[in-house]
Amino acid sequence: MIIFTLRRLLLLLVTLFFLTFIGFSLSYFTPHAPLQGASLWNAWVFWFNGLLHWDFGVSSINGQLISEQLKEVFPATMELCILAFGFALMVGIPVGMLAGVTRSKWPDRFISALALLGFSIPVFWLALLLTLFFSLTLGWLPVSGRFDLLYEVKPVTGFAIIDAWISDSPWRDEMVMSAIRHMVLPVLTLSVAPTTEVIRLMRISTIEVYDQNYVKAAATRGLSRFTILRRHVLHNALPPVIPRLGLQFSTMLTLAMITEMVFSWPGLGRWLIHAIRQQDYAAISAGVMVIGSLVIVVNVISDILGAMANPLKHKEWYALR
């Protein structure tokens, strides 16, 4: 396990190193780039040294430090993605197992059809439909933002629910509920695609495990179906799925950009899209580095967790994964 982890960490460092060239190219080769006046080597050394000190320069639009802007928008995106990913796991794992154990029966067909429908719906269209129904028609949920305009929450961690909870305001409970209400539609929109993919992965893995002889032997010993599912099926069906969850989280970061634009969520994706529109290359470079690094780190962590859950993966060569 130690060798496997070291290989993954080495792959992480090498990939991050090559990612720096992409980020640097946006600060050097683009028109009116901030580092264009220096030589290529000196510009890269200066840029990389700033990267190590979390210094991405200043925005060419408003003159603010990009690192300070990232501190404001990055937690908002992470809060949205973590909640959506958690919802996808809580729903996708049991529903996928149900589809697997009822293979070719009506529950499996219904779940598979519903998952296919959810996967095929465009994110922006789903967001508009949910907004039209729950916000504009029923008036149950807010349309945009993180809090109601009545509340002023001091940002401490950048996570809306946590900041509202640790606030010393007499309206703390109301602020927490306001934060939750503002998150319902963005989280629901963002969680649909990963939920359907988790359902598909768990269904395939459950079918493979359910046909194994040790599961049939457990049934002949008189164990209940719930015990078989909990002890044997879930324990063996989940490890092959874990390494693929990192890819789903990475995909969700891309979908978060669209979700943040529709719901005016002040996150990293919305900030990066505005930077692209305004041709703020220093901000674009910083956004690419942060998102790319997060994607790489999440995938490496998912591989390590998958290997810990499935010891047979320890001996696989990382270049073949």
UniProtKB/Swiss-Prot annotation:
Matching Pfam families: BPD_transp_1 (PF00528)
A GO term from the CC aspect: plasma membrane
Membrane spanning residue stretches: 9-29, 81-101, 114-134, 175-195, 249-269, 281-301
Subcellular location: Cell inner membrane
Induction: Part of the sapA-sapB-sapC-sapD-sapF operon, RNA detected in mid-log phase cells.
Record topological domains on the Periplasmic side: 30-80, 135-174, 270-280
Cytoplasmic side: 1-8, 102-113, 196-248, 302-321
ABC transmembrane type-1 domain span: 74-302
Gene Ontology molecular function: dipeptide transmembrane transporter activity
GO terms for biological process, alphabetical: protein transport
InterPro entries per UniProt: MetI-like, MetI-like_sf
Membrane topology term: Multi-pass membrane protein
Function of the protein: Involved in a peptide intake transport system that plays a role in the resistance to antimicrobial peptides.
Family, similarity comment: Belongs to the binding-protein-dependent transport system permease family. OppBC subfamily.
Protein name stated in the entry: Peptide transport system permease protein SapB
Annotated organism of origin: Salmonella typhimurium (strain LT2 / SGSC1412 / ATCC 700720)
